[in-house]
């Protein structure tokens, strides 16, 4: 049985993202992410951070105060903690967008770290979902109201790429990080199936601009 957790990072989210939180999920708020917990009416099970982007909250929730000088971001620390405690299905909210692009890139790296360690990981905001494609694990995605399906290599080369159920199918293809071959594909079936044999990929589902 999967152990589910939600990481709340600092980018403000809308209440629409409540749909990604299930009863019983372990909720970790990272630094200013505790404000997202308040927006979503969630009670964090754990708060972590160095509190450089928001004051440390006065709360009875378990809190781990991190040093300002450290290698891990607050979100990366939360990812380490959850992995060490056996969580294998993790959703990151408040991790995309915001004023600092480098934080989004750092959170994508954190997601990759989790995926490479066997976690089923999802990053989501109001317009998109991001999933990781790793060797040996077929990714089956539901069409729902998604318009675009894009695939990007995360580690230089993505090999043995197969995409089915999309307008631009691929079979045993090689993708490289310096050529965006996989951008703006579209569903042609109720589900799309993606596989790879080497490297790691990032799959982005996006709703229509209209």
Locate the predicted segments by residue.
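A glycine-rich helix N-cap at a beta->alpha junction
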Residues: 62-68, 118-122, 147-152, 157-158
């Amino acid at each position: 049985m999967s152990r589910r957790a939600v990481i709340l990072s600092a980018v403000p989210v809308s209440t629409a993202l409540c749909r990604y939180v299930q009863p019983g999920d372990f909720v970790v708020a990272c630094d200013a992410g505790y404000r997202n917990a308040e927006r979503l009416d969630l009670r964090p099970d754990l708060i972590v951070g160095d509190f450089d982007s928001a004051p440390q909250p006065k709360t009875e929730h378990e809190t781990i105060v991190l040093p300002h000088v450290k290698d891990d971001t607050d979100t990366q620390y939360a990812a380490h903690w959850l992995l060490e405690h056996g969580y294998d299905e993790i959703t990151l909210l408040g991790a995309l967008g915001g004023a600092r692009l480098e934080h989004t890139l750092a959170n994508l790296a954190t997601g990759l770290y989790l995926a490479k360690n066997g976690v089923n990981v999802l990053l989501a905001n109001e317009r998109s979902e991001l999933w990781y494609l790793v060797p040996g694990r077929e990714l089956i995605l539901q069409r729902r109201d998604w318009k675009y399906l894009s695939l990007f290599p995360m580690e230089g080369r993505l090999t043995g790429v197969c995409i089915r159920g999309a307008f631009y199918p691929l079979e045993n293809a090689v993708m490289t990080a310096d050529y965006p071959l996989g951008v703006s594909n579209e569903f042609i079936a109720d589900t799309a199936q993606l596989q790879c044999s080497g490297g790691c990929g990032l799959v982005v589902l996006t709703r229509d601009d209209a």
